[in-house]
UniProtKB/Swiss-Prot annotation:
The gene is kdgK. The keyword Kinase applies. It is an enzyme of class 2 (transferase). This is 2-dehydro-3-deoxygluconokinase. Its EC number is 2.7.1.45. GO terms for molecular function: 2-dehydro-3-deoxygluconokinase activity; ATP binding; nucleotide binding. ATP binds at residues 165-167, 193, 219-225, 248-251, 275. It comes from Thermus thermophilus (strain ATCC 27634 / DSM 579 / HB8).
Length: 309
C-alpha cells in the first residue's frame, strides 16, 4: 500500500555545465525535474512507497520523464501521456552566484490537470498527499485540481502536505495568498521558506500568523529550519556543504521531513533528515540526482548521532 502520493507537473531541465550566459553555451545537460517529481524520487530512494499523479506530453521528453520515474520505483498508476508537449526549463548561473530560470511550460500537458484527473480511491490508506504551490499557479484548472485533491484526501483521512513553493513568474503575491487562504483549512503540514514568507506577507512573523496549520516548517537556508508543532518551536541545524546546484534542495528537504513523519520519527529527527536531504541535493548537479538512498543515511550522518536503528 502506498504511503505518500504527490501530484503536479513534471519538467525537463536543460542546465549548462559552467556558469555564464546561456547564449554562449554549446553543451547543456538534461535532467528530469519538477517540484513534486523531485519529492517523489527522494521519497522512493528512502524506501517510502510513493505514487505520482501527473501528465506529460506524447513526446520524447515525456518518455524520458516516465522512464526515470519507473526506474526510481515510483508508482505511476495515475501517470498519463497526453496530447501536447512536456514542460521544459533552462537554468542559467552567472559567475557571482546569481541565477535565472527560463520556462517553456505554458499550455503544457502537465499544466492541464483538472478535478477528476485520477480516481480518488487511489488515496485510500495513504499517509500523506503532498502538493506544492506551483501546481495551482499553472492554470485555473490546475488550481481547481489542487483544491479537489485536498478535499478527496481529507474525506479519506489522509493528511495533506503543502509546500508553498512560490514562483513569482507564475502568479502574483495576491493570487498566491488568495489560494493559500482557501487551501489552509485542509492543510495538516505546511512548508515555506523565509524568503517566501517575506515576499508574500512582508515579514516572517506575519506569515506565521496568517499561515496557521497544525504543523508548519519554516526553511531558513544555511540557518537550518524551524518546525512549529503543538505550540512549540523546534530548531534544526543546517549541514554545511558547498552548494553546486540549489534547485531541488527545498523539495528534497520536504521529502526528508515527510519520510521522517511516515517513519514516526520525533520532530527533531525529521528536521535533521530534512536538512540532510536538502544539503545532499544542493551539493550535486540536477534537481534530485543527489538525493540519498536509505542505506546511505547512516554513513552520511556518521559525524553526528544517527537515528537509524
Amino acid at each position: 500500500m502506498l504511503e505518500v502520493v504527490t501530484a503536479g507537473e513534471p519538467l525537463v531541465a536543460l542546465v549548462p555545465q559552467e556558469p555564464g550566459h546561456l547564449r554562449g553555451k554549446r553543451l547543456l545537460e538534461v535532467y528530469v525535474g519538477g517540484a513534486e517529481v523531485n519529492v517523489a524520487v527522494a521519497l522512493a530512494r528512502l524506501g517510502v512507497k510513493v505514487g505520482f499523479v501527473g501528465r506529460v506530453g506524447e513526446d520524447e521528453l515525456g518518455a524520458m520523464v516516465e522512464e526515470r520515474l519507473r526506474a526510481e520505483g515510483v508508482d505511476l498508476t495515475h501517470f498519463r501521456r497526453a496530447p501536447g508537449f512536456t514542460g521544459l526549463y533552462l537554468r542559467e548561473y552567472l559567475p557571482l552566484g546569481q541565477g535565472r530560470v527560463f520556462y517553456y511550460r505554458k499550455g503544457s500537458a502537465g499544466s492541464a490537470l483538472a478535478p477528476g484527473a485520477f480516481d480518488p480511491d487511489y488515496l485510500e490508506g495513504v499517509r500523506f498527499l503532498h502538493l506544492s504551490g506551483i501546481t495551482p499557479a499553472l492554470s485555473p484548472e490546475a488550481r481547481a485540481f489542487s483544491l479537489w485533491a485536498m478535499e478527496e484526501a481529507k474525506r479519506r483521512g489522509v493528511r495533506v502536505s503543502l509546500d508553498v513553493n512560490y514562483r513569482q513568474t507564475l502568479w502574483s503575491p495576491e493570487e498566491a495568498r488568495g489560494f493559500l487562504e482557501r487551501a489552509l483549512p485542509g492543510v495538516d503540514l505546511l512548508f515555506l521558506s523565509e524568503e517566501e514568507a517575506e515576499l508574500l506577507f512582508g515579514r516572517v512573523e506575519e506569515a506565521l500568523r496568517a499561515l496557521s496549520a497544525p504543523e508548519v516548517v519554516l526553511k531558513r537556508g544555511a540557518k537550518g529550519a524551524w518546525a512549529f508543532v503543538d505550540g512549540r518551536r523546534v530548531e534544526g541545524s543546517a549541514f554545511a556543504v558547498e552548494a553546486v546546484d540549489p534547485v531541488g534542495a527545498g523539495d528534497a528537504f520536504a521529502a526528508g521531513y515527510l519520510a521522517g513523519a511516515v517513519w514516526g520519527l520525533p520532530v527533531e529527527e525529521r528536521l535533521r533528515l530534512a536538512n540532510l536531504l536538502g544539503a545532499s541535493v544542493a551539493a550535486s548537479r540536477g534537481d534530485h540526482e543527489g538525493a540519498p538512498y536509505r542505506e546511505d543515511l547512516e554513513v552520511l550522518l556518521k559525524a553526528t548521532q544517527t537515528f537509524m536503528r
